[in-house]
């Protein structure tokens, strides 16, 4: 069985993944807080987690993967100084928190489907596991890690000897950049203590509350992932995945409370793809004007062109997004589809069987290549090597199909280009391309976008290439 390596945040080095049970892998993913649409920066992380899971499957592993849905309790600060994200969404749209949660959960998985991100077999809303949260908190009380103060229940981080081991930083390092106007929660024994259960909070209008041994209230954010993972994936987790901004405090706190409860190491490998940035910095919903899959579609981009864009870069590198770089990726993706369509046509014409030995050799190389720290860009390079090789069309096609079980670019759905529009229609569209180029030069982005939409309505997409803008039949 192939060995797959990833950068392990816990050890700060690339390591081969050795599951607790040979041939079987457990993986937990921090799911979305469903108060708004996921932006494409969020989705980059889920794309890379999806690739990792599918690579293990191609390599012969049985993968059991779980994900939470945060539909309660996600405050932007454990000091109760931030915003309750679900309450924020409910106020913004004049709906209940559960209406918001249902809508944006469906929207999240709709975006995932467009990007060929496989839905985990285990998906658990936080609100469905309140008894499990309470049970875990009770266990922390029994073991001396929890205390009640001011009505709330807190985790005592001073009881954890290696609390900062995931971050590799000290308490002082992690306090750098904290705003001066953030008031400490006076109920805490230690600055890094965090809430396990709220009964008193500044959010008096919080509509989601439950009975508990400590009073009527709701769970803190961190408890949910520990309780859900322990329930569905057991006490020995192989890989925990999430965005890099979850390392501290969320994942640090998950480790503290999980290991305090079970009394041994909980998770061996921590997988944190880096941020997608735009020119102004990290993408964030709090900035407003978020860039979603739907926005990309409105501008004429295929969602899988964005997936291809992400696969071109290593997951441990911050990726800078611009429409220019996405245009280049979209152009390369369309050319790739065209080449695969030609191979499909040639294979159908020849009617021969693939050379399974050659296919297996290339699949082994693909697993070894991508499995060296999830190097998807080298995986794409190997794909192009197959396209240019002397293999028969049938062998190429069978190899591409196996590669695409991981890349998930719908390569096997590639079809020959449709017939072109009449000359007079193309002439009008070419004129629009000239006008769009002038608008872009003048930085008149509104006009450029309007022209792109007009071209799309005519059944074409604009693909920007080094030689200039080209028309592509949708």
PLM features: what roles do these ranges have?
Residues 88-96, 121-127, 215:
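The substrate-binding groove and active-site-proximal loops of carbohydrate-active enzymes
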Residues 11, 20-116, 464-471:
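N-terminal, positively charged nucleic-acid-binding surface of large information/translation enzymes
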Residues 62-64, 144-150, 390, 461-463:
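Short, well-structured beta-strand/strand-turn elements
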Residues 1-35, 50, 109-110, 130-344:
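Alpha-helical recognition segments enriched in aromatics with Gly/Pro capping
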Residues 66-73, 101-108, 118-133, 151-160:
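Short, glycine/charge-rich beta-strand/loop segments that flank catalytic centers
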């Amino acid at each position: 069985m192939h060995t797959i390596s990833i950068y392990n945040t816990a050890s700060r080095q690339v390591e081969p993944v050795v599951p607790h049970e040979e041939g079987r892998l457990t993986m937990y993913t921090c799911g979305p807080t469903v108060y708004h649409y996921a932006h494409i920066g969020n989705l980059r992380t889920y794309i890379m987690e999806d690739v990792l899971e599918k690579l293990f499957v191609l390599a012969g592993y049985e993968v059991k993967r779980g994900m939470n849905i945060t539909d309660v309790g996600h405050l932007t600060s454990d000091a109760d100084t931030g915003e309750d994200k679900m309450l924020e969404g409910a106020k913004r749209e004049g709906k209940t928190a559960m209406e918001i949660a249902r809508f944006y959960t469906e929207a999240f998985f709709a975006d995932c489907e467009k990007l060929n991100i496989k839905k985990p077999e285990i998906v658990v809303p936080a609100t469905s596991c309140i008894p499990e949260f309470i049970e875990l908190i009770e266990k922390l009380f029994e073991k001396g890690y929890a205390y009640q103060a001011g009505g709330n229940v807190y985790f005592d981080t001073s009881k954890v000897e290696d609390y900062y081991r995931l971050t590799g930083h000290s308490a002082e390092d992690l306090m750098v950049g904290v705003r001066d106007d953030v008031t400490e929660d006076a109920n805490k024994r230690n600055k890094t203590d965090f809430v396990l259960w709220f009964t008193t909070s500044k959010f008096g209008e919080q509509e989601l509350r439950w009975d508990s041994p400590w009073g009527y209230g709701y769970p803190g954010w961190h408890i949910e992932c520990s309780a859900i993972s322990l329930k569905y994936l057991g006490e020995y987790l192989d890989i925990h995945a999430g965005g890099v901004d979850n390392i501290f405090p969320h994942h640090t706190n998950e480790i503290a409370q999980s290991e305090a409860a079970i009394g041994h190491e909980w998770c061996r490998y921590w997988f944190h793809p880096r941020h997608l940035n735009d020119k102004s910095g990290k993408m964030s919903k709090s900035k407003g004007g978020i860039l979603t899959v739907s926005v990309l579609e409105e501008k004429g981009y295929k969602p899988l062109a964005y997936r291809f864009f992400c696969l071109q870069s290593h997951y441990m590198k911050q990726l800078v997004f611009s429409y220019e770089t996405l245009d280049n990726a979209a152009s390369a993706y369309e050319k790739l589809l065209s080449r695969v369509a030609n191979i499909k046509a040639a294979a159908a014409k020849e009617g021969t069987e693939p050379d399974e030995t050659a296919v297996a050799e290339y699949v082994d190389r693909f697993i070894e290549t991508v499995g060296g720290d999830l190097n998807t860009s080298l995986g794409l390079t190997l794909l192009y090597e197959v396209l240019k090789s002397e293999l028969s069309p049938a062998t190429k096609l069978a190899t591409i199909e196996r590669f695409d079980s991981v890349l998930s670019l719908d390569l096997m759905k590639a079809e020959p280009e449709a017939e072109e529009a009449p000359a007079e229609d193309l002439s009008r569209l070419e004129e629009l391309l000239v006008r769009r180029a002038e608008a872009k030069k003048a930085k008149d982005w509104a006009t450029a976008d309007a022209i792109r939409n007009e071209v799309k309505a005519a059944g074409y997409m604009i693909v920007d290439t080094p030689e200039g803008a080209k028309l592509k039949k949708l």
